[in-house]
Swiss-Prot record:
Residues carrying Phosphoserine: 372, 442
Single GO MF descriptor: phosphoprotein binding
Function: Involved in gene transcription regulation. Acts as a transcriptional repressor in concert with the corepressor UXT to regulate androgen receptor (AR) transcription. May act as a tumor suppressor to repress AR-mediated gene transcription and to inhibit anchorage-independent growth in prostate cancer cells. Required for cell survival in ovarian cancer cells. Together with UXT, associates with chromatin to the NKX3-1 promoter region. Antagonizes transcriptional modulation via hepatitis B virus X protein. Plays a central role in maintaining S6K1 signaling and BAD phosphorylation under normal growth conditions thereby protecting cells from potential deleterious effects of sustained S6K1 signaling. The URI1-PPP1CC complex acts as a central component of a negative feedback mechanism that counteracts excessive S6K1 survival signaling to BAD in response to growth factors. Mediates inhibition of PPP1CC phosphatase activity in mitochondria. Coordinates the regulation of nutrient-sensitive gene expression availability in a mTOR-dependent manner.
Stretches with biased composition (Acidic residues): 299-320
Gene name, Swiss-Prot/TrEMBL: URI1
Protein name per its UniProtKB record: Unconventional prefoldin RPB5 interactor 1
Region (Disordered): 1-23, 223-330, 352-383, 412-431
Subcellular location: Nucleus; Cytoplasm; Mitochondrion; Cell projection, Dendrite
Subunit annotation: Homodimer. Component of the PAQosome complex which is responsible for the biogenesis of several protein complexes and which consists of R2TP complex members RUVBL1, RUVBL2, RPAP3 and PIH1D1, URI complex members PFDN2, PFDN6, PDRG1, UXT and URI1 as well as ASDURF, POLR2E and DNAAF10/WDR92. Interacts with POLR2E/RPB5, RUVBL2 and RUVBL1. Interacts with PFDN2, PFDN4 and STAP1; the interactions are phosphorylation-dependent and occur in a growth-dependent manner in the mitochondrion. Interacts with UXT.
PTM remark: Phosphorylated. Phosphorylation occurs essentially on serine residues. Phosphorylation occurs in response to androgen treatment in prostate cancer cells in a mTOR-dependent manner. Phosphorylated; hyperhosphorylated in mitochondria in a mTORC-dependent signaling pathway. Phosphorylated at Ser-372 by RPS6KB1 in a growth factor- and rapamycin-dependent manner.
């Protein structure tokens, strides 16, 4: 409820103005003031009566809501307008629709409605109390105005006397003035001088610390640059690829092998033939030196040369090597070669946005170290396992020509679909045994099929091959190159299988029926020896 407004006389003139003349209090103004105050009192009384009626209505409603849920239905007279009624029935006695305000309604029970009524009754009582206070205040004012009017009527006009009071003390403090926008604060000169000296000393210290920090960072950057320039300690993909050291070791092994061959001029053909990896490497180096080609050979070329030399030894018993070196009596030097399957480098997709890449240089270096020892049937080297990811490099399945990691490395797979070095047929030991069996078969077929050549004719050729001058000056090769074709259909080239740590898919070629029958009848030396041991 708004408090009633009362008109008050205007404020007197400021003290600085000169003292005005005496202003008499007029009787009509006093009578008007009394009338306005009486209007306020009357208005308060009317409003108090209204709110008392509302309070009585809420009391009756509370009593009705408290007894309404006692019955399920009531017979009542339903009003139709202010004068028409119709008999009806009141049902759902425990459901009450409450007006929340602004035409919003909510359903509640009778007990909840009683709580709302009590809350609204408190608001009504508070409003009535406020109105009573206002009415009492204005009633006192009305009494004062009546007394004032009686005094003015009896004694005539009442004069209002006003006097100007001067202050004896001076206000020394300065009033605060609002600063202009974007203005700088003003300070005293002494304060500025002190701050300037402190700031200069602090700036010097900060500059020294900053330059010292910059010099330290430059030294660290230089050290990091020197470390990055060294290739020996580079770490990539979780594997330390010490390529320079491995290349040096490979060169040392190759040079040592060449010196051993050049120093030993004694015939040792059987020993050289038994150590196939070593002989293959030396033969490839001899071919390069005699033909005069000093070009760079990659690791893949070395592997191809090894396979070519093995095929030539198996099929022709050293004749092709003799002709390739150009030591024939009156014949043009000829190189016989055959295409081999290049081993495929494998990238294994683990399925979690990661790809395992094999270090080719590292594997080639390990293979060359193994070949330099001269043992063709050495123990199989297991891949180094440093992290859990290295385990899955050795356990891979082939599905539709693609490498898929195993869900569990403990489960076994068929040998056709597995590329694991432990379970598949492409392990190094089995490959060496199988290659040895093929070599023995080829030697037996060569001795049986070549009727025009005898053992006496092969011995001088072997002696000539052993007594070759290894330190021949390099010359350009001017002979012919002929692609070699396999004579016997029973002999299938061995599949090119890489290191067990670098799995490949061995190519499976169909074998003719005739070849299967012939190989079923013939027995190799190794198999015969095993049968004798079993017996």
């Amino acid at each position: 409820m708004e408090a009633p407004t009362v008109e008050t006389p205007p404020d007197p003139s400021p003290p600085s103005a000169p003292a005005p003349a005496l202003v008499p209090l007029r009787a009509p103004d006093v009578a008007r003031l009394r009338e306005e105050q009486e209007k306020v009192v009357t208005n308060c009384q009317e409003r108090i009566q209204h709110w008392k009626k509302v309070d009585n209505d809420y009391n009756a409603l509370r009593e009705r809501l408290s007894t309404l849920p006692d019955k399920l239905s009531y017979n009542i007279m339903v009003p139709f307008g202010p004068f028409a009624f119709m008999p009806g029935k009141l049902v759902h006695t425990n459901e009450v629709t409450v007006l929340l305000g602004d035409n919003w309604f909510a359903k509640c029970s009778a007990k909840q409605a009683v709580g709302l009524v009590e809350h609204r009754k408190e608001h009504v009582r508070k409003t009535i109390d406020d109105l009573k206070k206002v009415m009492k205040n204005f009633e006192s004012r009305v009494e004062f105005t009546e007394d004032l009017q009686k005094m003015s009527d009896a004694a005539g006009d009442i004069v209002d006397i006003r006097e100007e009071i001067k202050c004896d003390f001076e206000f020394k403090a300065k009033h605060r003035i609002a600063h202009k926008p974007h203005s700088k604060p003003k300070t005293s000169d002494i304060f500025e001088a002190d701050i300037a000296n402190d700031v200069k000393s602090k700036d010097l210290l900060a500059d020294k610390e900053l330059w010292a920090r910059l010099e330290e960072l430059e030294r660290q950057e230089e050290l990091l640059g020197e470390l990055d320039s060294k290739p020996d300690t580079v770490i990539a993909n979780g594997e330390d690829t010490t390529s320079s050291e491995e290349e040096k070791e490979d060169r040392n092994t190759n040079v040592n092998a060449m010196h051993q061959v050049t120093d030993s001029h004694t015939p040792c053909h059987k020993d050289v033939a038994s150590s196939e990896p070593f002989s293959g490497q030396v033969n490839s180096q001899l071919n390069c030196s005699v033909n005069g080609s000093s070009s760079y050979h990659s690791d893949d070329d070395d592997d191809d040369d090894d396979d070519d030399d093995d095929d030539n030894i198996d099929d022709d018993d050293g004749d092709n090597d003799h002709e390739a070196l150009g030591v024939g009596d009156n014949s043009i030097p000829t190189i016989y070669f055959s295409h081999t399957v290049e081993p495929k480098r494998v990238r294994i997709n683990t399925g979690k946005n990661t790809t395992l890449k094999f270090s080719e240089k590292k594997e080639e270096a390990k293979r060359k170290r193994k070949n330099s020892t001269g043992s063709g049937h050495s123990a199989q080297e297991l891949p180094t396992i440093r992290t859990p990811a290295d385990i899955y490099r050795a356990f891979v399945d082939v599905v539709n020509g693609e490498y898929v990691p195993r869900k569990s490395i403990l489960k076994s797979r068929s040998r056709e679909n597995s590329v694991c070095s432990d379970t598949s047929e492409s392990s190094a030991a089995e490959f060496d045994d199988r290659r040895g069996v093929l070599r023995s078969i080829s030697c037996e077929e060569a001795t049986c099929s070549d009727t025009s050549e005898s053992i006496l004719e092969e011995e001088p050729q072997e002696n000539q091959k052993k007594l070759l001058p290894l330190s021949v000056t390099p010359e350009a090769f001017s002979g012919t190159v002929i692609e070699k074709e396999f004579v016997s259909p029973s002999l299938t080239p061995p599949p090119a299988i890489a290191h067990p740590a670098l799995p490949t898919i061995p190519e499976r070629k169909e074998v003719l029926l005739e070849a299967s029958e012939e190989t079923g009848k013939r027995v190799s030396k190794f198999k015969a020896a095993r049968l004798q041991q079993k017996d």
